[in-house]
A protein has these predicted regions:
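Sec-dependent N-terminal signal peptides
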Residues: 3-13
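Hydrophobic alpha-helical membrane segments
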Residues: 17-146
Length: 146
């Protein structure tokens, strides 16, 4: 019970700029894990089945989705299976990261009258670096047959 108030109060202890960068890194990590799982599901389903033996095959196997495609037509295709859900999460996190970086850049431009290229480069490196790190670690986690 003590953990909940601590988790709720933790963001208040950070500085504003670190909160923005933490959001960029967190979104990159989530996007990287989602994309790594999506690629493992497609290219190495045996490793996914080995790591998650109790997962329903109808949920994680994208080959079985086309049989149920008429139920998931339109914008709700991400509820069809794990592959599409991971793709939806990855794209949503990319949009979130890009929006945060754009808002920071526009805010700096309005405050200073110029674009702070160094800060923009650091934010873009954090954005791409966190994504690639999480994706690589996810691939390594599922790489059980090496």
């Amino acid at each position: 019970m003590k953990l909940l108030p601590i988790l709720l109060l933790t963001p208040l202890l950070s500085f504003g700029q670190f909160k923005e960068r933490a959001a960029i890194v967190a979104a990159g990590l989530i996007a990287g894990v989602a994309d790594g799982q999506r690629e493992v599901i497609v290219h190495n389903p045996h490793a996914y089945r080995y790591r998650h033996p109790n997962a329903r095959e109808a949920w994680w196997n994208p080959d079985s989705t086309w049989r149920r495609a008429d139920r998931y037509a339109g914008p709700l295709v991400f509820v069809a299976d794990k592959y599409h859900l991971n793709q939806f999460i990855r794209q949503g996190m990319f949009v979130g990261q890009t929006t945060i970086v754009a808002v920071i850049t526009v805010g700096d431009y309005k405050a200073n009258g110029r674009i702070l290229w160094g800060k923009l480069a650091i934010n873009l490196l954090l954005m791409q670096g966190s994504y690639m790190l999480a994706k690589g670690l996810t691939h390594r986690y599922y790489d059980v047959f090496r």
